[in-house]
């Protein structure tokens, strides 16, 4: 079964030439919305995803504006309002070493370099300079771990395990 990933939501139309206004959910809009790429529009539940080919992409304020092959006026794209844009897992690009997709990290077990199990990563926050991983502990409050080289020693996405160095004051 194909695993799908949300890259944006069509929130409105823009102009009369078939452009749609998208709130992007991807860290790679230039790659995802590149002219010629295929995206899949997910409308109402129970309907098959509709493949569409991107014919133009530009940014406007906080939105990405897209047009699709075969849809050249506002009346043809009006029905897409509220739909999600997704890509299948095989369309996800390779990342550089030490970079991971959120879905690869969320659900990983976190252990110290001494083998002590701390919990499971449930969420990733992006407050500024670096991401912060939220660790759900079996007992007690959630633990916040900054994703920096001094703390995160190893990430094994195949085994769903992250090994960290516990600095003084971290726990």
UniProtKB/Swiss-Prot annotation:
It comes from the Bacteria. GO terms for molecular function: ribosome binding. InterPro entries: PRC-brl_dom, PRC_barrel-like_sf, RimM, RimM_N, RimM_N_sf, Transl_B-barrel_sf. The keyword Cytoplasm applies. Its main location: cytoplasm. Keywords: Chaperone, Cytoplasm, Ribosome biogenesis, rRNA processing. It holds the Pfam family RimM. The keyword rRNA processing applies. It is found in: Cytoplasm. GO terms for biological process: ribosomal small subunit biogenesis; rRNA processing. GO terms for cellular component: cytoplasm; ribosome. Residues 97-170 form the PRC barrel domain. Binds ribosomal protein uS19. An accessory protein needed during the final step in the assembly of 30S ribosomal subunit, possibly for assembly of the head region. Essential for efficient processing of 16S rRNA. May be needed both before and after RbfA during the maturation of 16S rRNA. It has affinity for free ribosomal 30S subunits but not for 70S ribosomes. Belongs to the RimM family. PANTHER family: RIBOSOME MATURATION FACTOR RIMM (PTHR33692:SF1). The PRC barrel domain binds ribosomal protein uS19. This is Ribosome maturation factor RimM. It comes from Bacillus cytotoxicus (strain DSM 22905 / CIP 110041 / 391-98 / NVH 391-98).
